[in-house]
Amino acid sequence: MNNSDISMSLANPHPANYNTLQKIGLAVIALGVLSLALAWVGIGSHQALLLLLSTLLGLGIGGLIFFYGTYGHLPEGIKNNRAFFSSISSRGALGWMLGIVLTGFYVSLYFFPEYMSGLTNMFEPLSQALRGTPSSQWFVYGTFYTVAVLVMGIKFIMKYRHSRYQVLRTISVSFFQLIFAWLLPAIMVRLYNYEPYLTYFWPLDYDAIFPSNIKYILSNGRLGQFVVVWGLVLTFIGTPVLTYFFGKRWYCSWVCGCGGLAETAGDPFRHLSDKSLRAWKIERVLIHSILGIILIMTALLLVDSAAKGGLLG
């Protein structure tokens, strides 16, 4: 007898049963999304602080409530239940919608920042309090980025709390994102009108040792001198030594903001990545090609600077 259940239903015949905490969390998240949408279209611009608090607290606290309701009552151990069947993490309707929203957000961020004026205005109170400068689309992006790493990092810890390594790694990458990539640069802008990123150095920051960039950094006095020396030490001493002993994971999984977002917010989607040998070969070619271009470009500019423009004019 064939026991397979072949359903013709347009709806999910076996929906996930959400408990009370999960439903409360989803409701709070929905309020945060509503506040975000109102701010984006410019509604309630005179209540920027209220919209900001309701957005960040709604998304943050709502997410934590939902994740605690999901993992808090379960025993320790890897839990990837329904990852291949969830609409949002298996190329379903919610996944496509999320992809379109995120793509639209990035297009607006880089090419049409004027369409983000509502969000920029919402973050004005926080930017003035923290940085002492007007808000910008990059401050909006950095704040959302940091909130995503922190909230999804706590979720990751709940999910992988049986692994001490994963817990420590997540705490580390969340710390570097919050302190070194968001809070410290903001404080430095307020104190010195300069925004250093101490975890971002050459060749990852490809123009970090361009002559014109070094000249600009050194114009910021002793802070600039420290940043230049710090970057050179990390590039030519710290990175080779740490990579020799630990591989690239010391940076990509423990320090880097990109890796932080991938390991936290990207965790539910990691099964979608191409794990074929062909994909790995393409990745190697791209990485080494880009590194080669950066090396050549940097060397040409340094030689040209030493020759006082005699090479490139």
Regions found by a protein language model. Name each.
Residues 2-313:
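Non-ligating segments of multi-cofactor redox enzymes
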